[in-house]
């Protein structure tokens, strides 16, 4: 396909299959967390553990996520990423079987560390998405990828509740094994895209792009951006670890964004585990009924996670370069305003509508924020940048542990209501990214020109 005079399109065109395959990994990761919350009562009764230790279970996997992120991020920039993900999902599926057979709580706690392998492989998924689809579709595709989490939540909260009520807490682990095996097979059949070709095509399209584009970087030549605050000279293919990570640490907007997302994601992490127990304890529901009501939140969240990218892209087409940031900040504040009374109320008639609306605004920032963090990183460093972000964002995984401690002191209803404002705090931190995002974006555009001008000059 021609991009212009004498220029041929480099990137292969992919359909929906790759994003569905990658979304399956998020589905399993999120769904298993939901089913773990359904199994919480059975685990406490069987192993005689406190609220603090049951809250520590979802937190334990972040240990491997932290330790594994850097080496997996490096591998994501060097090896076939689809096979890397398939191997991680194979380990995850094995761990599910071990969890189901756990004879003691210590055994269960230690084997759950293997669940973190999927979280450590997050950089590979983000890197793949950037190479499967055109730059201007990035926010939309990330939104579709993240929607896998909503499918997982529906399975983990709804279906797992029925299984746990029928067969006991171990069913919350057994149910994922067939899906894990199927995901491994799908990933092995998923093609590996060429690295950087989508960005190269964007570089050639820049001369003719108009404001119908929906990626911030692709609008760099049409928006009133400041000049880059730094000049790129790094050879990304042969640079050392120190040079690569040194370059990543210079991206100020990315770090404001990732810290803001980390703080905000603590509520998502906490709600993912304690949401079902909230309906059980405060509204006195069974596991299956609580899971059914929790799906109401999932409906709002499903619309939000898909809509976020479209809303930000629409604003971007109007020339608002900080659109991703504005959407994330505004929705974080609105979600907080909605969820505080939702948790404080003891009436389902009040809580359910607020959960539906709150779920929408809680996930609305997800795709714009992830796209923002990708926009400001040059293509050859995306895997390693995503690895660093995963390490920082894993801190949000301690939320179930913190809420468990607050629950023991004040009760679950108060604990969730008190913890919720942290979501707005994360949004306000992200606001500071707006100051440096345009300049960082201009740097990526300049680097795209530099990197692709060199091979063309040599032909």
Protein language model features and the residues they cover:
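Juxtamembrane intracellular "pre-TM" segments in multi-pass secondary transporters
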Residues: 3-12, 199-256, 282, 451-456
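Extracytoplasmic gate region of multi-pass secondary transporters
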Residues: 36-37, 251-305, 366, 370
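Helix-breaking motifs and short loop linkers at transmembrane-helix boundaries and internal kinks
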Residues: 48, 80, 101-106, 284, ...
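Central cavity-lining transmembrane alpha-helices of secondary-active solute carriers
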Residues: 59-72, 295-308
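Conserved MFS/SLC helix-loop-helix module at the cytosolic interface between two early adjacent transmembrane helices
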Residues: 67-105
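Structural signature of the two symmetry-related core transmembrane helices
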Residues: 83-97, 322-339
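Cytoplasmic helix-loop-helix junction between adjacent transmembrane helices
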Residues: 111-150
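Helix-loop-helix hairpin linking two adjacent transmembrane segments in secondary transporters
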Residues: 145-195
């Amino acid at each position: 396909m021609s991009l212009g005079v004498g220029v041929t399109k480099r990137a292969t065109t992919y359909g929906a299959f790759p994003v569905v395959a990658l979304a399956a990994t998020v589905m399993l990761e999120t769904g298993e967390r939901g089913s773990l919350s359904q199994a919480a009562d059975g685990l406490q009764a069987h192993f005689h553990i406190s609220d603090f230790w049951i809250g520590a279970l979802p937190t334990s996997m972040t240990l491997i996520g932290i330790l594994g992120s850097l080496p997996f991020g490096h591998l994501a920039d060097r090896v076939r990423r689809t096979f890397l993900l398939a191997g991680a999902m194979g380990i995850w599926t094995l761990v599910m079987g071990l969890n189901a057979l756990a004879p003691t709580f210590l055994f269960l706690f230690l084997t759950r560390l293997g669940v973190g392998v999927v979280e450590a492989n997050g950089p590979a998924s983000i890197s793949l998405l950037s190479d499967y689809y055109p730059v201007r579709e990035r926010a939309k595709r990330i939104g579709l990828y993240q929607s896998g989490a909503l499918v997982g939540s529906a399975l983990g909260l709804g279906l797992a509740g029925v299984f746990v009520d029928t067969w006991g807490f171990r069913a919350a682990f057994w149910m994922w094994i067939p899906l894990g095996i199927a995901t491994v097979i799908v990933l092995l059949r998923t093609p590996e895209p060429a690295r950087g070709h989508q960005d190269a095509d964007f570089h050639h399209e820049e001369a003719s792009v108009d404001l119908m584009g929906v990626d911030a970087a692709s609008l760099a030549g049409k928006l009133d951006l400041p000049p880059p605050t730094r000049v790129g000279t790094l050879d990304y293919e042969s640079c050392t670890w120190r040079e690569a990570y040194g370059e990543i640490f210079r991206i100020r907007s990315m770090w404001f964004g990732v810290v803001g997302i980390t703080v905000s994601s603590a509520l998502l992490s906490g709600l993912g585990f304690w949401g079902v127990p909230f309906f059980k304890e405060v509204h006195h529901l069974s596991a299956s009924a609580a899971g059914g009501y929790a799906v109401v939140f999932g409906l709002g969240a499903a619309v939000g996670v898909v809509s976020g990218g479209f809303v930000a892209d629409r604003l971007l087409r109007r020339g608002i370069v900080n659109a991703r940031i504005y959407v994330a900040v505004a929705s974080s504040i609105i979600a907080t305003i909605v969820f505080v009374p939702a948790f404080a109320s003891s009436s389902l008639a009040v809580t359910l509508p607020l959960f539906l609306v709150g779920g929408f605004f809680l996930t609305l920032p997800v795709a714009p924020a992830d796209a923002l963090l990708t926009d400001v990183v040059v293509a050859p460093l995306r895997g390693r940048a995503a690895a660093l972000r995963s390490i920082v964002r894993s801190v949000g995984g301690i939320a179930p542990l913190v809420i468990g401690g607050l629950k023991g002191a004040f009760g679950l209803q108060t604990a969730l209501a008190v913890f919720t404002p942290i979501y707005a705090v994360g949004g306000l931190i992200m606001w500071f990214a707006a100051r440096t995002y345009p300049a960082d974006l201009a740097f990526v555009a300049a680097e795209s020109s530099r990197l692709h001008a060199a091979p063309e000059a040599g032909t």
